[in-house]
Design a protein with these regions (language model features):
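Histidine/lysine/aspartate-rich catalytic loop segments that bind and position anionic ligands
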Residues: 69-96, 100-102
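Glycine/aspartate-rich loop-and-adjacent alpha/beta segment that forms the canonical ThDP
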Residues: 117-182
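Generic beta-sheet signal
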Residues: 43-47, 74, 133-141
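Conserved thiamine diphosphate
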Residues: 40-43, 90-123, 174, 178-182
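Acidic, glycine-rich active-site loops and adjacent beta-strand->loop/helix elements
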Residues: 49-56, 80-84, 115-117, 143
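A short alpha/beta connector and helix-capping loop motif
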Residues: 56-81, 136-139
Length: 182
């Protein structure tokens, strides 16, 4: 499985750094975005963070850095599903209001339904047009979407299915896909 844990740079094409829940990915992404600009490289740098991960101070320091250096080639994507390994993020250490905080740190911020592909496509297109500041796309999602026993269940954070659970999950996902294709 590609994403049983944080994406691994050695097994997932396009992933340049293996990160985790401590927020170091955005700091590295800032360095990559600044280096690209200094080398006149027109690439864009994307980093994915979880809403539990943004409880880390390093994330907000990186946001200040990105804003200060006007890293408009940086796009920060936040999965806002309201859950982390320890439970509901609002109960553990609330990062809310996420959008307002990102804007206060100087990021152009776009809030989307993370399950709506049209909204996601529009957000990424908009991010490419923003000049003079980094962009954050905050996706509101449902953890475990499409698998009844996983939806909104923090207990599935980093947990693998057993063979029977896998079959049930795949059956539900295949049924949902067939419905979309109909």
């Amino acid at each position: 499985m590609l994403f049983r844990s944080p994406p691994n740079m050695n097994t997932v094409p396009g992933v340049d750094m293996s990160t985790g829940s401590l927020g170091q990915g955005i700091s590295t992404a800032c360095g990559m975005a600044l280096a690209a600009r200094l080398q006149n490289n027109p690439c864009r740098v994307y980093t994915l963070l979880g809403d539990g991960e943004i409880q880390e101070g390093q994330v907000w320091e990186a946001c200040m850095f990105a804003s200060h250096y006007k890293l408009d080639n940086l796009c920060v994507i936040i999965d806002n599903n309201g859950l982390q390994i320890d439970g509901n993020i609002a109960d553990v250490m609330s990062p809310y209001p996420i959008v307002d905080k990102l804007q206060a740190f100087g990021l152009h911020t776009i809030a989307v339904d993370g399950h709506n592909f049209d909204e996601l496509e529009a957000a990424f297109a908009e991010a490419k047009t923003v000049k003079g500041k980094p962009t954050a796309i905050v996706m509101t999602t449902t953890k475990g979407k499409g698998v009844s026993f996983m939806e909104n269940n923090a207990g599935w954070h980093g947990k693998s299915t057993n063979p029977a659970e896998f079959e049930i999950a795949m059956g539900e996902l295949k049924a949902a896909l067939a419905e979309l294709e109909a």
